[in-house]
């Protein structure tokens, strides 16, 4: 991984912060579907510590904290305990749609590694969150993520967004 890709969001944040003289030292991320796939891996593998809050919604597949080969797991990945601690201690809202359960959705990764995570986005998300809970307990790492399932939701950016904004804006004076 090049440092530019590895810390790409941090570079954009710093550029805009300087260009517009912004007075904040942190930023938030909203990732849905493929954006969620990128965002959770960015948090896990970058050196960026400026990320404050993150919403992860309905990724098609994940990098589990287990011994499966990368990109489905962490086998042979150069990551230190401190990064796991940082990753699991972020303020993350993990949102799934209970009806995002189409195993044949046109944009769903149906590779062998992805199918081992579950047959659809909802199952894969449930399994990923369980993996994080187990990993944090086994390694005695604080886990701050929030988990939300929206009962009548399939694969919809707008519905995820409506649930994400209160979390992203929480505590802001606007």
Residue map of PLM features:
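Solvent-exposed, polar/charged alpha-helical surfaces in well-ordered, non-transmembrane soluble domains
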Residues: 7-14, 40, 126, 130
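Short beta-strand immediately N-terminal to the catalytic nucleophile in serine-hydrolase-like folds
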Residues: 28-31, 57
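Phosphate/oxyanion-binding active-site loops and adjacent basic polyanion-contact surfaces
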Residues: 1-9, 121-125, 157-160
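Extracellular/periplasmic catalytic domains that process cell-envelope and extracellular macromolecules
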Residues: 22-23, 47-49, 84-89, 140-141
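Alpha/beta-hydrolase active-site loop
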Residues: 1-21, 27
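C-terminal catalytic histidine-bearing segment of alpha/beta-hydrolase fold enzymes
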Residues: 126-174
């Amino acid at each position: 991984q090049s440092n530019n890709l590895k810390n790409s969001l941090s570079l954009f944040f710093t550029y805009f912060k300087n260009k517009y003289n912004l007075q904040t030292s942190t930023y938030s991320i909203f990732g849905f579907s493929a954006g969620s796939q990128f965002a959770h891996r960015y948090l896990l593998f970058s050196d960026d510590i400026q990320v404050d809050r993150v919403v992860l919604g309905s990724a098609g597949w994940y990098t589990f904290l287990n011994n499966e080969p990368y990109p489905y797991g962490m086998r042979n990945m150069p990551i230190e305990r401190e990064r796991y601690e940082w990753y699991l201690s972020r303020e993350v809202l993990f949102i799934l749609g209970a009806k995002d359960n189409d195993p044949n959705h046109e944009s769903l990764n149906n590779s062998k590694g992805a199918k081992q995570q579950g047959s659809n986005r909802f199952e894969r998300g449930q399994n990923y969150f369980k993996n994080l809970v187990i990993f944090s307990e086994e390694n005695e790492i604080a886990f701050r993520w929030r988990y939300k399932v929206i009962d009548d939701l399939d694969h919809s950016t707008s519905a995820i967004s409506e649930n994400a904004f209160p979390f992203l804006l929480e505590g802001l004076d606007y």
